[in-house]
Amino acid sequence: MPALFVQERMGVNRKPFRMFKFRTMYDRAEEMRAQIEEFNESSGGLFKIRMDPRITPVGRFLRRFSLDEVPQLLNVVRGEMVLVGPRPLPRRDFENYYEEWHYSRHQGMPGLTCLWQVSGRSDLDFHNMCILDVYYLRNQGWLMDLKILLKTIWVVLFARGAY
């Protein structure tokens, strides 16, 4: 099983791109999703389960401290992502949007971290994630980015809302 996981995500202006992560799930995790869909603890375009059985023990550690996201620095270097911007959703989750305004979160470049990650992370539902993403896009600037980057360090170190 390769250490890197590549998944199609939705980027700026709904353009798909290949996002890199360290693998944190067992093989055939996507096939298993249908069997555990009823345990989804989120809504809309998000699929979150606190004790997701598809995640390996090492994967749980990597996710707890967001270390699985490190390969996305390659996406930043390639110009597909920026440090701060709305997190890109997997294409499958993207197709679950249920209100037209939710798509407006794709008017900016996707980022490694974002306002909703430092405001609750996985504890926020899809609707509030979109509200924070749209707020960020309408108010973004270097000072807001700096605040989000600094808060990200705190959130990651203390694993706030990580699962």
Predicted features, each with a name:
Residues 1-163:
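Conserved small/aromatic sequence motifs within transmembrane helices
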